[in-house]
């Protein structure tokens, strides 16, 4: 930063961006919670078990260990893997139901994003992180990462459309 004023502007911009993101997250989570309550449906047990297993694997990665060693560590602390998975079940079900609702709405509303919209996302990411668009594109050169960005852009487009409809 060249001046204290530049620093202040950047801090204010970052705070506003974080605030806007938090508000959008709260609104979308509230919407999904209401939809789950209004339109209840069951998740197949196999889907729930796959999600819980994925969370267990991720936790093992975070502890930089194997799932088997993680289970031994959990047992040594007086808990069990089964008890831990039970505590995760409610959140896992809500997340899966939310994902199904979002995917269904995106499909039913034929929501797609154009290459121009993805370019705009690259620019927003670059501006928000103080890096170049080329650096952002390099990160998203991996097809999986780019697919995640595209899915996120579709989801944001869905929420924007829904919130415009209910104003």
Where are these regions (language model features)?
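Extended, charged alpha-helical "arm"/coiled-coil substrate-binding scaffolds
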Residues: 1-167
């Amino acid at each position: 930063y060249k001046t204290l004023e530049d620093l202040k502007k950047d801090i204010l911009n970052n705070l506003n961006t974080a605030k806007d993101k938090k508000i959008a997250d709260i609104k979308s989570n509230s919407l999904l919670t209401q939809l789950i309550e209004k339109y209840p449906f069951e998740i197949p047990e196999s889907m729930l078990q796959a999600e819980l297993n994925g969370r267990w694997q991720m936790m093992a990665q975070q502890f930089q260990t194997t799932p088997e060693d993680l289970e031994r560590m959990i047992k040594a602390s007086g808990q069990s893997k089964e008890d831990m998975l039970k505590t995760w079940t409610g959140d896992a079900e809500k997340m899966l139901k939310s994902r199904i609702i979002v995917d269904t709405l995106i499909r039913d509303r034929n929501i797609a994003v154009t290459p121009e919209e993805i370019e705009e996302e690259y620019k927003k990411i670059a501006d928000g992180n103080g890096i170049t668009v080329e650096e952002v594109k390099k990160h998203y050169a991996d097809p999986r990462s780019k697919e995640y960005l595209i899915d996120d852009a579709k989801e944001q487009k869905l929420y924007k459309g829904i919130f415009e409809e209910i104003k």
